[in-house]
Amino acid sequence: MGQKINPTGLRVGIIKDWESKWYAGKDYADLLHEDIKIREYLENRLSTAAVSSIEIERAANRVNITIHTGKPGMVIGKGGSEVEALRKSLNNLTGKRVHINIVEIKKVDLDATLVADSIARQLENRISFRRAQKQAIQRAMRGGAKGIKTQVSGRLGGADIARAEHYSEGTVPLHTLRADIDYGTAEADTTYGKLGVKVWIYRGEVLPTKTDK
């Protein structure tokens, strides 16, 4: 089970939180489509800003968006010009008041989405898939990861038959629900077709906190 399922989905409600936080009645489908539009717009516009995740919260006619990024300066812009332009665009897109929070990711080598994206960009620049994966693993382990696993699949090196190759170091306990495992994917567009990149990073155990009764 833990080997196949998305590690984040398996842990939501246990040690992971939802990325969309709102309740809805009959307009649920409309709000869900609006969420998808917001995410697609931000991912396209901020494609070079190392965006890891986007959280969306709703209250009445207001949308609060939290962007987790490794390059906050690119998102904010000079004097906040870029984030203000972003807010106006999202206001027009949704027809609602939008508030944007920027959260900086301190350790980019321990963020699976950013690591996967980095490997994908290297593959597009014709760097060997083995070298790209091994360098990512070394950086993550130096950065304090307990374990990491990477996989690249597709026509590796322009081979006629597609295959998958993975490398790992340390431990990645996918069945342990209290294990803080970050999972990220990315795609690389090469001259031979698309290559898929998957990354699992084990950052240690998250112990449940005692609540006052």
Swiss-Prot record:
Domain of life (superkingdom): Bacteria
Disulfide bonds: none
Sequence intervals crossing the membrane: none
CDD domains for the chain: KH-II_30S_S3
GO biological process entries: translation
Keyword annotations: Ribonucleoprotein, Ribosomal protein, RNA-binding, rRNA-binding
GO molecular function, one term: rRNA binding
Any one Gene Ontology cellular component term annotated for this protein: cytosolic small ribosomal subunit
Residue ranges of every copy of the KH type-2 domain listed in the record: 38-106
Entry-linked HAMAP family: Ribosomal_uS3_B
The protein's role, per its UniProt record: Binds the lower part of the 30S subunit head. Binds mRNA in the 70S ribosome, positioning it for translation.
Xref: NCBIfam families: rpsC_bact
Subunit and partners: Part of the 30S ribosomal subunit. Forms a tight complex with proteins S10 and S14.
Family label: Belongs to the universal ribosomal protein uS3 family.
Descriptive protein name: Small ribosomal subunit protein uS3
Organism field: Oceanobacillus iheyensis (strain DSM 14371 / CIP 107618 / JCM 11309 / KCTC 3954 / HTE831)
Underlying gene: rpsC
